């Protein structure tokens, strides 16, 4: 048994929360409010349809409790997806606005780390700079040609790398 998340970050993160609930029982919000730690997670698989959050490769999830509108995250190696199908063709029907939002999300995740102080960050900063350049260059290409496979592939890969411990 496993959960197949078909979509972007919100869908994937919801699948992770469901996986915690199935594997552990009780109230899922106990994990997200840090009242208890998960002892497992139903395996997650992903078919990515928008490049943005990097959730397809991460051990983190962020969900919103609509009762009080509390947005909070939880991370555990248990919920890192077992596989992610990342086919840029699945993003080609996205409206330009959603593509731009995804590219902006990738940039923000990368800049968040880039502008955080730290020692001995030369390599990490160089990776972040390369990711930002890649996203900016390919966002321009996608504005002119939304069906450009290579630009979508570059953005998809950058999104997965930008929020998964490299930067």
Predicted regions and their residues:
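N-terminal small/polar loop signature for handling phosphorylated ligands or for N-terminal nucleophile
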Residues: 1-26, 141-152
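Surface-exposed, flexible loop/turn segments at secondary-structure boundaries
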Residues: 11, 52, 163
């Amino acid at each position: 048994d496993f959960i197949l998340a078909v979509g972007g970050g919100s869908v994937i993160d919801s699948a992770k929360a469901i996986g915690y609930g199935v594997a552990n029982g009780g109230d899922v919000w106990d994990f997200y409010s840090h009242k208890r730690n998960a002892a497992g997670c139903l395996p997650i698989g992903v078919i990515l349809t928008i490049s943005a959050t990097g959730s397809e490769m991460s051990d983190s999830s962020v969900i919103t409790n609509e009762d009080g509108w509390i947005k909070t995250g939880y991370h555990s190696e248990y919920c890192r997806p077992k596989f992610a199908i990342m086919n840029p063709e699945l993003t080609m029907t996205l409206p330009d606005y959603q593509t731009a939002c995804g590219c902006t999300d990738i940039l923000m995740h990368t800049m968040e780390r880039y502008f955080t102080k730290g020692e001995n960050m030369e390599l990490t900063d160089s990776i972040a700079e390369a990711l930002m350049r890649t996203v900016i260059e390919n966002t321009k290409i996608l504005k002119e040609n939304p069906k450009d496979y290579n630009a979508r592939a570059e953005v998809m890969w950058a999104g997965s790398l930008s929020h998964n411990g490299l930067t």
